[in-house]
C-alpha cells in the first residue's frame, strides 16, 4: 500500500477483524484516529456505545484539521456503512486529499474468536454479525465489483485482505511523490 501526505486511510472491517492491530503495525500513533480511543476519552469506556456520537464528532473535527494541515491520517473504526465512509470522504474531498480503503474481510469464525478473546472491549455477537454481513455484501459480487464500488464512493485506491497471511504481508510505502499537493 502506497501513501503520501496528506492522505486518508480508512480501515473497513468488523469488530475483531484486526483493524487496530494493522493500524498500530503500519502507522505512527500520531497518525491514528481511533473510534474506540475517542469513546474512552468521552466516557471512560471504549465499549460504551452511548459515547459513539460525541466520539465521532471529535473524530470528524480532528480529521478535518489534520487533513487541512497536510497530514497522513488513519481512521480506525468499523466503517462498514457507506454513510460512515461518505462522511470521511467528504472531509478528504474538502481538503483535496486522496483516500485509500483497507478492507479486512477475514473469515467469520476468526473474527468471532478474536472478539470473544477481547478482555477489554468485546462487542456483542449480533453487532459483529451485522458488521460481517456489511463486509460480505460489499464483496458479494467479487473483488473487482467491490473495488469499483469503493472507487465510486471516492476512494483513490483500495486494498482488500481476506486472510491473516495477507494481513501479515501488508506493507506500507511512504512516497512523497504520490502526494496530491
Region roles according to the model:
Residues 73-76, 101:
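Short catalytic-loop micro-motif centered on adjacent basic/acidic residues
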